[in-house]
Amino acid sequence: MGAAGNTGSSGDSRELMSAADVGRTVSRIAHQIIEKTALDGPDGPRVVLLGIPTRGVTLADRLARNIGEYSGVEVGHGALDITLYRDDLMQKPPRPLEATSIPAGGIDDALVILVDDVLYSGRSVRSALDALRDVGRPRVVQLAVLVDRGHRELPLRAEYVGKNVPTSRSESVHVLLAEHDGADGVVISR
């Protein structure tokens, strides 16, 4: 996604996170979600993780597996396609629609955690909030990201952040995940 950077890398680049770092970070975010939501408590909320395609869906799947392993609570997870809700639809090359998949219980009255790989301007998150409105009415919506690179254009913040990485606007942050790229890692490039 261009400047947000979640596909490939080019030019001068340097590693920000190794595969081991990515694994530890996803594990830490899973623990934070369990702790902050009291998910494993007697009155824990129904939590649904919805990944923003493409890499956010993979991260949501990994988080759900980790949360289940650490807490013993199975968390519903799926994908939320934001393509038709983007405000830059006519400015970027066309991209294929992704499937939106919502867990069987739906999202009404659930604590929904949107999951994305990189938080940059906040426009993808705004698009996800618009898409979410057409799917149901969650009780609470939170955001989890692997990397927050700053430069917000909208008043949004993530509750769960793997790594804060100050960047310039001329740099791109690329999250690599084994399921898509053959290996895990995060690189920054100019």
Curated annotation (Swiss-Prot):
InterPro entries: PRibTrfase_dom (IPR000836), PRTase-like (IPR029057), PyrR (IPR023050), PyrR_bifunctional (IPR050137). SUPFAM superfamilies: PRTase-like. GO terms for biological process: regulation of DNA-templated transcription. Belongs to the purine/pyrimidine phosphoribosyltransferase family. PyrR subfamily. This is Bifunctional protein PyrR. Pfam families: Pribosyltran. It catalyses: UMP + diphosphate = 5-phospho-alpha-D-ribose 1-diphosphate + uracil. It is an enzyme of class 2 (transferase). Regulates the transcription of the pyrimidine nucleotide (pyr) operon in response to exogenous pyrimidines. Also displays a weak uracil phosphoribosyltransferase activity which is not physiologically significant. It comes from the Bacteria. The keyword Transit peptide does not apply. CDD domains: PRTases_typeI. Keywords: Glycosyltransferase, Transcription, Transcription regulation, Transferase.
